[in-house]
Amino acid sequence: MKRIEKYLLLLIVIAISLFTLLVITNKTRYLDYKIFVMIHNIIKYNDINMVKLISDLSVILGILLSSLMALYFSKKMFLKNIINIIFAYVLNFCIKICFCIPRPSWKLTSAVGYSYPSAHTMLALVVYGNIIYLTNTFIKQRVIRIIICMLSVFMIILTGLSRIYLGVHYASDVIGAYIIALIYLLGINYFYETSNNSRKIMKNNVK
């Protein structure tokens, strides 16, 4: 990881720390509700069950696609993909337990567990982020890369919006999930890069 990337990661960590402080002190609630109302004013769609289905399937589809892509290109990448997903889920669970923030009072469907950060959103960014990484690493055709990356970004945004629309998460839960997932991906990639470099150095020393 280059020095500028380390500074960027540090700034993002500081930003999410400050943002989380605003969330746990209820400083974002007014804006959260305004965003909830705004989304419902823009997206006038009343089939809550369909939105919930889209919200759930977007993550399941992402897990399946990222796993199949990773398995196709490299068994090692498949293992990393599974580890990334499991660790992301565990990280989300730990943060939820740490802050114990209840879900919005205006939720339109049932949901269990705590609110911050959104697990669906975190997992969506992780799995579709993995798809983007695999696409840029292994697929050579530029047009196909662009299409897959654009669809992946669309699914990441759609998942977050669906959670806010359903009222099962505050907008701040979704924003926080995006930032935390981004930090997680940067951190895990740095770990993999460092591990690979260490192995190469050890092999060279043995030779």
What are the roles of these predicted feature ranges?
Residues 1-61, 97-99, 103-108:
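N-terminal transmembrane-helix/juxtamembrane module of multi-pass inner/ER membrane proteins
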Residues 3-4, 49, 74, 78, ...:
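Hydrophobic, aromatic-rich alpha-helical transmembrane segments
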Residues 11-15, 81, 85-89, 93, ...:
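Alpha-helical transmembrane spans of integral membrane proteins, capturing the lipid-embedded, hydrophobic core
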Residues 21-23, 67-73, 163-164:
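Hydrophobic alpha-helical transmembrane segments
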Residues 29, 61, 71-141, 145-147:
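Membrane-interface loops
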Residues 108-207:
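Membrane-embedded catalytic cores of phosphoryl/pyrophosphoryl-handling enzymes
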